[in-house]
């Protein structure tokens, strides 16, 4: 079967329950879950592991969005507002393309995320290329690895 787009576990995780799913038939987002118990001190930003990687077509991207309940119920926000997972992040030699959520604790108390809690939503989308685009770089990492 040809793979078009989807999720796989990173090799260091075996809990199939971590594979994202949509909760309703009309939901755009796949819920990504916490793969390891994670404590976030007040005011800190922590990379929360999801245990998954995503594959997609060359003209697609995966966006990570905060869950609307995070600020109100947990005191957490996805600090970069929208996470952008490029197709060439999949299979990244540094971490297999493991998706992390950059979460900030906006409370004055430690927030603990337990394994299996839903943390962010992931939405696949197409993207367009501008005229004259000549991008030919090769990904070597994640979280700003292609920046200068």
PLM regions and their residue ranges:
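DUTPase catalytic domain/fold
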Residues: 1-148
